């Protein structure tokens, strides 16, 4: 009986929820009074909302920076294509001062574009190789003929001299007579009988 009570107590202790240390204060205030618990809940909600707003603001700023970098890189590409076709002397007033971070972002974007082009070329090569292999397999399948099956011994050119005439067309006993033992007719007159006949 004591063992049963002890196991029940242990099971209930294990089944109780364990609260993290930072929420023990909240758990104790809920037991103490409902007014303090509602204020702490509101405070936690406000903190979560504030953190969420900060994350949204950071994401928005990052997306704006990325858009600016992309637009600048496209403008520079267009300007470089125009300057390569026509010799235009850039004015100092038109040039923008690019901070070091923007230069790093620009280099990263250029590397990404080169990497994307490289992967596209590799994918095209792989696709061409697969297509070539498919065409080869298709052509080989059309050329191949099924192998002829030779059931007779003399179908091969070496069969005539390898197998003698008595071996080539040997008549075999039917399989139904195999279980019946074969022994000489005068087996009763002999003194020694085979073991398998007994």
From Swiss-Prot:
Name of the coding gene:
CSN1S1
Q: Which UniProt keywords apply?
A: Milk protein, Phosphoprotein, Secreted, Signal
**Modified residue annotations for Phosphoserine:** 39, 80-81, 83-85
What species was this sequence derived from?
Cavia porcellus (Guinea pig)
Signal peptide start and end residues: 1-15
Descriptive protein name: Alpha-S1-casein
Instruction: From the UniProt record, list the coiled-coil ranges.
Output: none
Region: Disordered, residue numbers: 28-47, 71-97
**GO annotation, biological process:** response to 11-deoxycorticosterone; response to dehydroepiandrosterone; response to estradiol; response to progesterone
